[in-house]
Structures are given as C-alpha cells and as structure tokens.
Amino acid sequence: MRFTAKAASQGLRFAAAAGSALVLAITSFAVESQTAGDPTPYADVHPYFEEPLPQLIKRVPELKHLQPVQSQADLTAILQKTGERVDDFFRHITDLTAREDISLGRLMQERPSSRPELSGERVRDSYLILRHSSKNRSDIIEYRTDAKGDNFDQTVVKRGFIVTSGFALSCNYFSTGFQPESAFRYLGDEQIGSQNTYVVGFAQQPGKATLSVRMQGRSGTPVQMLVQGVAWIDQRNFQIVRLRTDLLAPRWDVGLNQQTTEVTFGKVQLADVPAPLWLPSSVKVHVEFTTHNGNVDEFYELSYRNEHRYSDYQRYRVATKVIP
C-alpha cells in the first residue's frame, strides 16, 4: 500500500542568514514518478547499520543501551507486522489540527578563527494534517498557519531560520508498499522508558527508492537525497515509537553535511476516531551546511537546530456559514 505524503509548506526551508537572498527548500516524503535514488552520489556508500556496534553507537548515541542480537531470523516477521501497523495508520489518518511550539536555533561561523554567531527564537503555530482522497489515491498534506490563518513558514524563513516538517508521515519508510525500497537489519532490543522495543536499522537503496528528501535552490533544479536511520518498535503492538533519520551520505555538491531528525511518537485517542493514532509528540532536527574542504581560504559553516513539541491534537473541521 502506498500513500502520497508531502508538506505543503515545502518541508524544510532555510535561508543562509537573515535577509539573505539564498533560499532553499526540502520537501520530505514526496513520491516521484521517476526513481529518486540516483546512484551517482552514493557510489561505495555503506549504511551505518553495517558498522561495528561501538562505531554505530558513536553515530547514534541513542543506541547506548542496545542489547544486540546475532540472528536476523525475526526480521521478516517484525517488518511484516510493523508494515501492517503503518498501513493501518495511513488508512485511519484524518484531518487534524494541533498546537505546535518550536524552538528555532541558528549557528553561523564564517572562518575557523571567527567567533560563532548564535541566534534563536521561540514560535507557536497551528499545525494541520489534511487528507485529500480520490478514487485511486490519497494525498496527506501538512500545513502551518499563524494566528491570522496565514502561511507561517514564510515569516520564519525571512528571519533566517529553517522550518521543518513532515514528521507525522515519516513512518512511511516502513509501510508495506515502500519496504522493498530499503535494506533493513534487526539490531537488537532496547528499553525506551517503560517500553521494550525492537530496534531496526534501515537504509534506502539507490536506484530503487522513490521516497526522498528533496532540496531545491535558486536554480530551480531539485536535488534528491536518500536517508538511513533507526526505528524503535514496541514489542507489544509493533508500533514505531521513535524514529531517527540521517542522510545516507553527505551531499557536498550542495554543501549539505548533515541532516538528522529524531521523532518521538505518542498515542492520541480522538473521541470520534475508533482507532488510536500515533502522532509526533516531540521532534529534534539538526541540519548542517559547510563549504570547508580542507582549504582555509574557503570556510563557512551554518547549522540549524529545531525542537518541536505538539499538543492538543483534535479533528480539524472547516466551519461554514450560510449567507442568505
């Protein structure tokens, strides 16, 4: 089963600095008609789940309490049941609204000897998930609006910060329709709070993947980027309770060194929706750009750290007024 999922606000948007003319956009989880996984940037790239455990923990510190397994015998069953759970989520997802509080951070350093420039803001918006269904497909779109109902993202971008979204849809990598596009490995078991979880690593496969993170610059030419990551899956019900994604490889051609997203999902029971929905409760995003290539005459680093918190999920209904 495949669902088209995209962010109407262009997913991730960012500017190099406040007032800068450079504006890029990343759209997460957009299904393309052509294969998104151009293998050229990923030649000789190996997923980090293939690294020895000590090296993997350095990359993903959340795995420090992992109890590794030696066999992959349970992987097929875990993927099957998790995929069915993800499919069920997309079948039941409906129009939703929530309150979103975001902490925005930007750190810029122009030269190795210069002092880093740190800036930040806290903002609040209305977060919408809207489902548009037709006979043959179902599109799930995210929006953000301010108190006046206007597009929220443009205001933040003009201030030089990055706006990040797409988190409610990120479990799509594990849906039954998209699992063939990735490689998976059962890493072991780990306790997350009171939950015992299966820990599964995944990596999109170049040449097969159609889900992608897409960056678009001033030239208008989009850059397709693939991801790898780790999912923590509740052993009782095969629900993904935490998901981390990283770039499959840095994209030096566009100056993108790192993009890490960590999503924690929480159970939401709406009064008029029979099945509970597992939706983002908190998200951390780190995006890092650099032009440093070993030559001290060319050095520029820019990083963003956003933290999102979601609360008060409700059914979204459009009010109509009949005018005589």
Label each PLM-derived region with a short phrase.
Residues 9-10, 17-19, 71, 183:
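Hydrophobic alpha-helical segments and their boundary regions
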Residues 32-228, 235-241, 246-260, 264-324:
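Structured extracytoplasmic
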Residues 1-11:
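N-terminal secretory signal peptides that target proteins for export/translocation
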Residues 2-3, 24, 33:
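Long, intrinsically disordered, low-complexity accessory segments associated with secretion
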Residues 13-27:
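Bacterial N-terminal signal peptides
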